[in-house]
């Protein structure tokens, strides 16, 4: 679909907590070891929110960095959207807390919930407000404190997740061939049982739930792996085809940081050199909706991106959801 207005990335920012949880740390908590974790996931450590830190505080810190990169003030923002599966609370929206932290008292703010696909869902939502001519500057955030819903007695899942936030400022641009030029969003609620965190209106939290440790994330690892392997390759192929990109003209693949083996396998099958995938899962683990914007910010600050470069985003997560996007820097 063609658009008359472009929605470009004017600035990026990210923030991760200082506390590191290494594989050796986890080995002292559950029956695992560094070699086992690295071989199966590529993860060596992850960041964990400390006292006084939350999804909103991480998000606000990333947002401030994105504003600085875009040379804007908080007052220049027309809208704030936060993609998260670990909101500050059921309500108000995490984005409202971020707006208040930035000193704003009338800027619209809301959350998007699509688990690990949440950032691409949020990106598309923000871009469409700009394309409609309604807003000029939109803050798009992916932020998570997954440590708060991780069961550190479950060795199959506690090794995977970390906390962090990434943010971008999307801005109106006269050239519709710049910025977000392609995206596709999908969901299949029939797969809801594959990845879930059950406390809610269907299952109000109770003593029995806590006694059975059911307040934490529940993941069917093998099913997730099969789903991710299939969708990763499919989504990138579709995005490249839609934008007439080749392995030579794609500058960078910025995937959801789910598993090093999945990323490596897909890149090989697609005929893409491994160095074209930006990967930081070894340092942060899986940060769900935050993983893509954190990786994008790091790639940008490392000088890996220049104006005109084509960047592909790809993600999949609970819902089940899956999504991809192409941005022309």
Regions found by a protein language model. Give the residues of each.
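Flexible, glycine-rich active-site loops centered on histidine and acidic residues
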Residues: 131-165
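Conserved catalytic cysteine-centered active-site region
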Residues: 38-57, 85-138, 268-296
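Active-site pocket-lining segment
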Residues: 228-233, 247, 251-270
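Catalytic phosphate/nucleotide-handling subdomain of diverse soluble enzymes
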Residues: 294-314, 324-329
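Acidic, glycine-rich active-site loops and adjacent beta-strand->loop/helix elements
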Residues: 15, 83-88, 114-119, 142-147, ...
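Condensing-enzyme catalytic core mediating Claisen C-C bond formation in acyl metabolism
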Residues: 1-51, 154-226, 230, 234, ...
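Buried hydrophobic positions in well-ordered alpha/beta secondary-structure cores of metabolic enzymes
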Residues: 9-11, 37, 66, 77-80, ...
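Phosphate/pyrophosphate-binding loops at sites that engage ATP/ADP/AMP, CoA/4′-phosphopantetheine
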Residues: 62-78, 234-251, 299-304
